[in-house]
């Protein structure tokens, strides 16, 4: 949590020593651990004349790391702020004057480490306030996976699956069964033998009308401990129903920009070689290769010194329930089971000793207690949950209109019990429905709408978090930074043009991408270009709407209440 510091009155110590002691005690009560990166939730004392708020985006990442800063919400009761100064390199000096930019500035951190960055604001009466935010820069070599080689997104590389006719036919007997069969795979010129290949997906698997399904490769299914550059599973998504092919990739990039722990993604061309049919390799089309959320993912983001904590994958189905983060008691057996035997929070790690106490405790804090005030709820929540990470996630999904997740459908996310902090982390997943593909338009409200669009009928975390005034401000500050530096017409135009230039040739490679050419094609190559232009238009309109809301001060309003609590169907 970010520490808020307040201006002193300049009294001489020898005159009011007892008063100073009292004031220091009060101020100390407001200080919290700065490494968490969120604001305190206590209401601003009535005798404060000036308040500073410092925000960073991202607040953590791999070096070299460019961070954008804002003083969103900083204000004086005696007039406007006339000076914004930053200590951006943590050297103790305010050597960056951002007054001309109303407090906005940027800085690149090349050296790994934790930096305490301080903002100082001054009003026309000479009153001063400061605020600090921590930026954590990680060394790429500390990762167990060379992400920058495996997920090199500066080029489109070739992946070729080499499989027998019998095994290929076995997949197509029932694609929905996701049967694993043996094959070899060439990844960017490097071959792995005897991997397991299977289809993946749910709705997209059923609806894709040709062989361009999404694929999952398990490297160690037939050969124990076999890995590809320290990865055991490789995922290739077909970008079903996205004519632009860009939604998922750009959504992951946007999350990374916001400082949300999200997977890497890169474009590849996927080929199939039936090794015993005397025919050349067949081109399926362009895919997005996406990093899997697993023990290595969380270890590389949150560390391994204290072991790997419990990782849960959220699930949802109509009628039978969803991962709603509601409290159903102390027995995990009482919680929703969307697919019958499996609980909505599917344990992915530490399977030898299944333990759901962390999830139950989080649900209890979120939904099982009546609090005296939003501030009391916030104090309890921050003991068990990384609120700042969740607010950054919400800022991204409500800005780019990805409604196929919490707080609407109740799936497409993970929860991780971080053993280092003792808090639960919220991790996004499956982002192909971003940019309004699952609903929402340019004027979708800043704080969203009452849930729900699918299986989820009750989203207490969504409702309660936005009842806290400080959280609404922090969230709005993150939306502001996104709109200013990433989600706007100039930046998105450059991104769409760059990606389309890179991947456009892959649509007509060989016999053509099966999503665009041949039997079962869902789009035309012209729609690829048109949908990219539509993404630009939606982004521009959405950014204009959000900017108007932020500038008007309407961000201080509360969100609509969620629907009533559901009754589980056995």
Feature names for model-found ranges:
Residues 181-238:
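Conserved oxyanion/phosphate-binding beta-strand-loop segments in alpha/beta enzyme cores
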Residues 38-51, 136-149, 552-570:
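Low-complexity, Pro/Thr/Ser/Gly/Ala-rich linker/spacer regions in secreted
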Residues 6-19:
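N-terminal Sec-pathway targeting helices
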Residues 148, 156, 167, 171, ...:
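Middle-to-C-terminal accessory/interaction subdomains
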Residues 34-142:
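Extracellular/lumenal mature domains of secreted and surface-exposed proteins
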Residues 258-271, 405:
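Short, well-structured beta-strand/strand-turn elements
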Residues 140-180:
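N-terminal module-boundary/linker segments of secreted carbohydrate-active enzymes
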Residues 214-224, 236-240, 260-263, 275, ...:
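Internal "kinase-insert"/substrate-recognition segments embedded within catalytic cores
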């Amino acid at each position: 949590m970010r520490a808020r510091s307040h201006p002193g009155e300049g009294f001489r110590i020898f005159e009011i020593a007892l008063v100073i002691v009292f004031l220091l005690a009060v101020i100390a009560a407001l200080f919290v651990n700065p490494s968490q990166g969120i604001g305190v939730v206590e209401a601003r004392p009535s005798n404060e004349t000036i308040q500073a708020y410092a925000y960073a985006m991202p607040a953590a990442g791999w070096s070299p790391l460019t961070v954008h800063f804002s003083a969103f919400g900083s204000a004086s009761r005696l007039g406007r702020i006339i000076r914004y100064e930053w200590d951006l390199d943590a050297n103790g000096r305010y050597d960056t004057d951002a007054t001309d930019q109303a407090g906005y500035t940027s800085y690149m951190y090349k050296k790994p480490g934790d930096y305490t960055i301080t903002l100082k604001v001054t009003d026309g009466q000479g009153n001063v306030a400061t605020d600090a935010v921590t930026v954590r820069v990680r060394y790429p070599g500390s990762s167990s996976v060379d992400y920058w080689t495996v997920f090199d997104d500066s080029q489109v590389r070739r992946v070729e699956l080499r499989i027998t006719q019998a095994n290929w036919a076995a997949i197509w007997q029932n694609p929905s069964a996701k049967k694993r069969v043996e094959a070899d795979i060439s990844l960017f010129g490097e071959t792995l033998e005897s991997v397991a290949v299977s289809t993946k997906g749910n709705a997209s698997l059923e609806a894709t009308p040709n062989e361009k399904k999404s694929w999952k490769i398990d490297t160690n299914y037939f050969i124990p401990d076999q890995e590809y550059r320290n990865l055991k599973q490789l995922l290739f998504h077909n970008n079903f129903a996205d004519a632009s092919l860009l939604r998922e990739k750009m959504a992951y990039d946007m999350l990374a920009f916001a400082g949300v722990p999200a997977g890497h993604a890169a474009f590849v061309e996927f080929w199939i070689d039936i090794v015993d049919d005397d025919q050349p390799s067949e081109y399926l089309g362009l895919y997005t290769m996406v990093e899997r959320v697993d023990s290595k993912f969380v270890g590389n983001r949150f560390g391994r010194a204290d072991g790997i904590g419990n990782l849960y994958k959220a699930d949802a189905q109509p009628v039978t329930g969803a991962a709603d983060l509601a409290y159903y008691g102390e027995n995990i057996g009482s919680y929703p089971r969307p697919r019958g035997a499996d609980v909505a929070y599917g344990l992915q790690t530490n399977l030898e000793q299944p333990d759901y106490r962390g999830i139950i405790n989080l649900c209890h804090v979120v939904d099982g207690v009546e609090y005296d005030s939003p501030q009391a709820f916030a104090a309890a929540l921050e003991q068990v949950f990384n609120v700042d990470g969740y607010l950054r996630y919400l800022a991204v999904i409500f800005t780019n209109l990805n409604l196929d997740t919490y707080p609407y459908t109740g799936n497409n996310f993970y929860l991780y019990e971080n053993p280092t902090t003792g808090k639960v982390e919220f991790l996004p997943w499956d982002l192909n429905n971003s940019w309004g593909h699952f609903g929402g338009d340019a004027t979708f409200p800043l704080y969203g709408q009452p849930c729900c669009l699918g299986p989820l009928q009750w989203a207490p975390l969504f409702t309660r978090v936005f009842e806290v005034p400080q959280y609404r401000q922090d969230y709005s500050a993150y939306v502001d930074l996104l709109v200013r530096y990433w989600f706007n017409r100039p930046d998105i135009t450059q991104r769409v043009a760059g990606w389309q230039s890179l991947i456009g040739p892959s649509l007509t490679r060989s016999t053509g991408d099966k999503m665009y050419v041949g039997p079962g094609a869902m789009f035309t190559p012209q729609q690829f270009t048109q949908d990219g232009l539509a993404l630009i238009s939606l982004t521009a309109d959405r950014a204009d709407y959000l900017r108007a809301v932020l500038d008007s001060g309407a961000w201080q309003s509360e969100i609509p209440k969620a629907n009533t609590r559901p009754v589980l169907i056995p």
